[in-house]
């Protein structure tokens, strides 16, 4: 099995320690490193008098990890001394002695890393902990308890504070990582590792800034697609550009992460993420021994929170009423004023959990000297962890309630101190589920839109730049929009009675262009505006409109279906424009009005950057954008051996239904050869995984033909007849491919052309090899791979499988 490139950091096999001060690892050596740790005195390292051999390191092998904690002025000499061992990773801890030039320290680490093929975490990292291994490679004096939540932070103080708090409430972690100054290993690379880490069920991230928006976007998307990712990001300054704030919020929403805004919410998130049961919706039932706590929780739910009060079924209300005293509240919130008993708590929980209109239960308890709260908490400790729906508790108070909260914490169910934090924690769980539901939604198929005249648009912009023109005239702006078939016309005046809208584009220095839709003739990013990052498809464009306050208050009633479709198309095509023409600094269509069903603009301004377009964005991977757009330039018409035409193109989210039809249409043998199982159709998760592609790190291609559609009077429809994709391997250097061709289209030359395109794309992404597992009985596939230059090896773990692989360096040569 391939080893992840960060495995040497999180699961090192050999370790060298160079430190001028005591570290926790000196007192407790992890079991996996028994007889494999070498302590090198700092004077020896600085003088390059390091030992020839290290403990547990065979001759000729690389050292996995070096832990360095020395004054910044000594770090370069220590790194040079470590070259002898060719370390895979160096962890540079923060040192009490300040640096004269922190920026130069980081630059030196990057240069040394590049010259020596070695990754560096730091400088000025707080360190790394892997509690299940007993490994504490940090400054924190105590190792965290083992758990299933990973903590990643860019702040040493935040890491220390969270570890101290977690020890007090007996919360554990799968990993704790403080990245420091991100010399080489950054947050994105850590997220990549944690997304595949079997010990990690969820990730809590404290973020101050992102050094590479594209890498962060890609890694966050990969992580959030398989486990909850909670992000606390501080604003970099009190006067931070609101465009960046809105763009970053849009980015997190796009990748499926959940953003929190306050430090106290980080504690709530970490605590609630240990809950193995996740809500399937947003409807919450409240159970309280007094109405004060319930009112506080409802206040939180009523201020734009992710969750809301569930409507109980009539049978549930009747059942609850039979268990409560006269005068109690049986409809949500369920409130009892009599002393609670264990039997009553168990009965109430059973009813609320069984209600189909309830997705989770929030139990709020205040101290009650007349009640046996210990027995009540014992019921919660027994019922909540085993419940099929999440049960979150809030035990208000400290003197008598702290010990009871610890009982629930030890039982593995989160117990909070205030109604606000408990309700917010539920919102975090529900928010993640909601984002994943959206991510797996099957979009209806849509035809590829009419291709734009990109060359003409770029020539228009370049001509203006050569003239020193930074702002296009309205007529030039309209011509630019016309190159991308944006359905908007110019008008002199606002039509009477028309709604006044605005479409705006601004360029964020880190995240690239962001789009806004809302009320016209207002400052950018008014409260009623919604923001999204391009590229947009039809679904995202509709969501952008419908998320705006202007739609909810006015447009939903005044916009006709035809006009709404024109608006959707305009947004989608403007997003394509700013993707393909990076020189656009800003774009304002304000006011945007309606003349009948036609979109007309009485104000149009396009500002250009001063940098000329010498390099086409498709050759740089659209580096000016946080999200890689659909690589339309890869779409090509091809021919089969007999001359029949077919289209080779990258897959889109809208291909989910056609791809499902393709898989259903495969023969049992073809499905088994591809999936090594007898599945008859793809699961929703598999469909989303194969069609919602991160073009920055992977690629999926389809072969399609046009055929008459009997449902629509024989009008042509696109049909998928072949599918190929590759996903990056854990080592970050190669990718695993998969290929399947429809039965009636095999031996037509389609498979070889799809594979050649995959190989070219993998080379452009600087991968060094591409491989895959093929059933030994699949002789046609083995023959094709051999024909394409792949080598065939037996699989060590399964004799029925073959590993086929291609060295892309050799192919390039």
Predicted regions mapped to residue ranges:
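Catalytic-core regions of core metabolic enzymes
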Residues: 1-603
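Catalytic activation segment of kinase domains across protein kinase-like and atypical kinase folds
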Residues: 599-613
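Long, contiguous binding/interaction regions
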Residues: 610-813
